[in-house]
């Protein structure tokens, strides 16, 4: 299974794709406008040459986007981050809830709680326990916990663009073992949830492993990729650290 190195490699590759996308899109649009201007002025030769340049840039961009989409469709293996010891639900909760920057924790029941962490970003972490994972049961459990936490700690859903871009949600599920349902849940590509204004990252802890969904081939903006990378680093560092030592950002 791919691990932390592959995760960060795929994040970097997605950022490079975004940069290449922007660099190709700008000259393509500029060439198109020039071609239109030449055509309007009656200079058909220059218009044809400029249109050809535009077609080249557009063709390269389309090829890159198709390659990115193919990688996204082929990325079905989740990332496995090693942990120093096996974790159960209570020890996971203790590691997260004692982190620097925790603003509040709401205990919904013995298997679900929500906590808010303010640091580089504003994280809302749902801590859920599913001995045997079920996607429908997990969704119902998460929705119930979020509704209860929203009543106890109301927060505005909208805001300035920079405020929204600084928020992220982490759904951290603790399971006793990996079953087919959990493999499908964590194996689902992160693209759709990362594309939301307040991006969502699904994670799971099973024994001495932290599992994260694939991001290979992602086509999302830089802030969303940064939130994904920072969220993974936050949870992994909290679970790897000695509770008596300060957290070290990865």
Model-derived segments and their meaning:
Residues 2-4, 60-125:
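N-terminal topogenic membrane-targeting module
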Residues 118-123, 128-134, 174-178, 207-208:
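Short, flexible beta-strand-to-coil junctions
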Residues 25-38:
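N-terminal signal sequences
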Residues 39-54:
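Hydrophobic alpha-helical transmembrane segments
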Residues 188-250:
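Charged, structured surface patches that assemble and position nucleic-acid processing machinery
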Residues 30-31, 52-56:
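Core hydrophobic alpha-helical transmembrane segments of single-pass membrane proteins
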Residues 131-191:
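Catalytic cores of nucleic-acid endonucleases
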Residues 3-27:
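Juxtamembrane interface helix immediately N-terminal to a transmembrane segment
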């Amino acid at each position: 299974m791919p691990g932390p190195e592959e995760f960060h490699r795929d994040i970097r590759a997605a950022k490079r794709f975004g940069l290449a996308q922007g660099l190709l899109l700008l000259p393509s649009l500029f060439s198109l406008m020039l071609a239109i201007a030449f055509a309007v002025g009656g200079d058909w030769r220059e218009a044809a040459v400029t249109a050809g340049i535009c077609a080249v840039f557009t063709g390269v961009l389309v090829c890159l986007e198709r390659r990115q989409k193919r990688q996204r469709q082929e990325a079905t293996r989740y990332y496995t981050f090693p942990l120093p010891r096996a974790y159960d639900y209570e020890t996971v909760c203790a590691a997260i809830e004692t982190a620097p920057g925790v603003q509040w924790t709401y205990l919904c029941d013995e298997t679900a709680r929500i906590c808010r962490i303010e640091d580089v970003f504003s994280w809302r972490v749902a801590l859920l326990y599913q001995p045997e994972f079920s996607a429908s049961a997990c969704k119902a459990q998460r929705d119930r916990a979020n509704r209860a936490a929203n009543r106890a700690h109301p927060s505005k859903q909208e805001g300035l663009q920079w405020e929204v871009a600084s928020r992220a949600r982490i759904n951290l599920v603790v399971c006793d073992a990996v079953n087919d349902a959990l493999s499908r849940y964590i194996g689902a590509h992160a693209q759709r949830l990362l594309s939301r204004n307040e991006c969502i990252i699904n994670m799971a802890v099973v024994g001495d492993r932290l599992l994260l969904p694939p991001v290979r081939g992602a086509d999302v903006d830089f802030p969303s990729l940064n939130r994904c990378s920072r969220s993974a680093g936050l949870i992994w560092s909290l679970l790897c650290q000695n509770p008596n030592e300060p957290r070290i950002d990865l």
